[in-house]
């Protein structure tokens, strides 16, 4: 039964990722006053399926000088971790109801760094290695702020469990009292998923394609799926943390529908940002984090720790 549940979670995620690629191409197309893909199927709806067939039927090339086992393992690990991160997410019920769901997601996203590092190192290409080192530095840096912001939100919620957040936000979305945290969280998720304007790892002008430059066909598709699964995942967490979802036990469909709509709107915002902003310079990216976000998030975290301690000493006003 667990296997059936697992498949019922994985297959929709992969389908969502497939159609997110189409949505991205269509959105960017219309923002640049053109149509986007419209040949394969009605209005280009079958384009992702055609792309998948093309990629998975190509010959899996690998460089002669590469470390074979690592080269093959890296994309598999990337996708496995991207899909594993979904397990504690309440939609409205999680696949595994974890007591420390937030901690699990943080740990899994930290492990994703290894797949990037392996792919860059095993490719035995200078472009791939530079891209991988950039990606690792960027991901590790922005995880610091993500963890501190999560801690601040969890202090308001009072629990590490994700379903508790919907109970916390029954009367008021957390984005309203904690909007600076929400803004910093959103920008950090952009950087964490290597999206524009922080897509320095795949800077076409200087690094060809970043850490996946030597990958082709199926293995490239696995990295691609992992990247887009992480984008949807991050937006789903943003929705759960800040755009509270009212859970009515008699109408679980309502929760799922509102969750889906909010996540979709957040994802479209990601695409909109990609169409609008140029790429950051690498030093600007690091300055933004270490000199702006980190002091701010630490200050806000201390604020959220001190307020309950301060108010605990006030006697109840009866």
Swiss-Prot record:
Keywords: Electron transport, Membrane, Mitochondrion, Mitochondrion inner membrane, NAD, Respiratory chain, Translocase, Transmembrane, Transmembrane helix, Transport, Ubiquinone. It holds the Pfam family NADHdh. PROSITE patterns: COMPLEX1_ND1_1, COMPLEX1_ND1_2. Its EC number is 7.1.1.2. The chain crosses the membrane at residues 2-22, 70-90, 100-120, 140-160, 172-192, 217-237, 253-273, 294-314. GO terms for molecular function: NADH dehydrogenase (ubiquinone) activity. It comes from the Eukaryota. HAMAP family: NDH1_NuoH. This is NADH-ubiquinone oxidoreductase chain 1. It comes from Emballonura alecto.
